[in-house]
Regions:
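Glycine-centered flexible beta-alpha turn that most often forms the glycine-rich phosphate-binding loop
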Residues: 18
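Short, conserved loop/helix-junction motifs that constitute active-site signature segments
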Residues: 7, 34-36
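Active-site region of PLP-dependent enzymes
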Residues: 21-29, 37-147
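Active-site core of PLP-dependent enzymes with the aminotransferase class I/II
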Residues: 1-14, 24-27
Length: 147
């Protein structure tokens, strides 16, 4: 990741880190998703992942402009921020569509399902690590090289 990050700075491209299977993981002592070497990190909450919300995912970034753009896109490109509007706000209830966007908002029920599992994420990661250790041992005893 460090080399990819260096190349991105040298050649001017962005890095999106796919951490779909890495919720709760660490790399070089830092939490995966901290965007140390990427502009955005994405996680999946599909049912086969460590944490599930039945569908959906999460994106993290340290870049405020990227975060603002993601917030806008997730909600049909709508804003209530008067500084971004092209005309004067008519009141607190007023909103404006300033960009094309999508409906990428998770339902409250799906979010609650995901949040309820967060207390157990360390245990889930530990259990997966234990299982991986068993596979490593069995493959080693079988004379197979694991890449």
């Amino acid at each position: 990741m460090k080399k990819i990050s260096s190349l991105s700075k040298e050649y001017g491209f962005s890095v999106i880190e796919d951490a779909s299977h890495a919720i709760g993981g660490r790399y070089q002592g830092k939490s995966i998703g901290c965007c140390q070497y990427s502009d955005i990190t994405v996680f999946s909450f599909h049912p086969v992942k460590i944490i599930t919300t039945a569908e959906g995912g999460l994106a993290t970034t340290n870049d405020v402009s990227i975060a603002d753009k993601m917030k806008s896109l997730r909600s049909h490109g709508i804003t209530r921020d008067t500084s971004l509007m092209t005309s004067v706000s008519e009141g607190d209830w007023y909103y404006q569509q300033i960009d094309l966007g999508f409906n990428y908002r998770m339902t409250d029920v799906h979010a609650a399902l995901g949040v309820s599992q967060m207390k157990q994420v360390d245990e889930f990661v530990r259990r997966r690590s234990d299982i991986a250790g068993i596979y490593d041992k069995e493959f080693k005893d079988a004379g197979l090289d694991v890449l």
